[in-house]
């Protein structure tokens, strides 16, 4: 199992402002693909107005070969640039990015432990047994992560067979009716 290798980008402007974004491909071979897509997309941003964020999205999405069907790597690159541009716009206007996106909606946010099928904390491995899933759940709960996200319904069942103190969060490829 590969370790966590985040790919961060910085977009610099002529005025001296800069914004930071993250390519969301931090595990496995994805990090190298993330670097590659940024190298391909970066020249398309140079010389343009960084405050015109929608123009970049429209260009990347509608006028590049991979925009409308690019998959994870392409969209991770687009997203990293988008995040960096929002960072620049917030700095330029002197407001937090959440204000640009509609304002604060919560005083506190619930967090959840994600991707537990790969373990928790510094221990990275593909989990196989119900006991391994339960151990990952316990480790997350030990640091007050009271919500756990599992990518496969099988992993939920495996953890629940050993450990019952969890709230279930699923993603769109799972169907679990929860009352």
Regions found by a protein language model. Name each.
Residues 82-118, 143-146:
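Glycine-rich, aromatic-flanked loop segments that form ligand/cofactor-binding clefts
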Residues 40, 80-83, 87-88, 99, ...:
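Alpha-helical scaffold segments in soluble metabolic enzymes
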Residues 108, 112-179:
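Metal-dependent enolase-superfamily TIM-barrel catalytic cores that perform enediolate-based chemistry
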Residues 5, 17, 42, 57, ...:
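Generic secondary-structure boundary/loop-capping signal
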Residues 70, 74, 78-82, 90-93, ...:
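Short capping loops/turns at secondary-structure boundaries
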Residues 1-10:
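Short, Gly/Pro- and small/polar-rich lid/capping loops
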Residues 9, 14-15, 20, 52, ...:
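Ligand-binding pocket scaffold of soluble enzyme catalytic domains
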Residues 12-92:
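Metal- or metallocofactor-binding catalytic centers and their adjacent structured scaffolds
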């Amino acid at each position: 199992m590969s370790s966590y290798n985040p790919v961060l980008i910085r977009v610099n402007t002529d005025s001296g402002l800069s914004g930071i974004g993250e390519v969301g491909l931090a595990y496995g071979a994805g990090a190298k693909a993330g670097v590659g897509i940024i190298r391909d997309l970066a020249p398309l941003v140079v010389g343009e107005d960084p405050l015109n964020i929608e123009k970049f999205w429209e260009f990347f999405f509608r006028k590049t070969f991979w925009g409308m069907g690019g998959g994870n790597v392409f969209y991770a690159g687009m997203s990293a640039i988008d995040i960096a541009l929002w960072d620049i716009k917030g700095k330029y206007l002197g407001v937090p990015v959440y204000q640009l996106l509609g304002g604060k909606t919560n005083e506190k946010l619930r967090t959840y432990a994600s991707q537990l099928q790969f373990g928790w904390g510094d221990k990275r491995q593909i989990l196989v047994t119900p006991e391994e899933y339960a151990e990952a759940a316990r480790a997350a709960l030990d640091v007050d992560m009271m919500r756990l996200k599992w990518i496969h319904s099988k992993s939920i069942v495996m953890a629940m067979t050993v450990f019952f103190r969890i709230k279930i969060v699923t993603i769109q490829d799972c169907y679990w009716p929860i009352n």
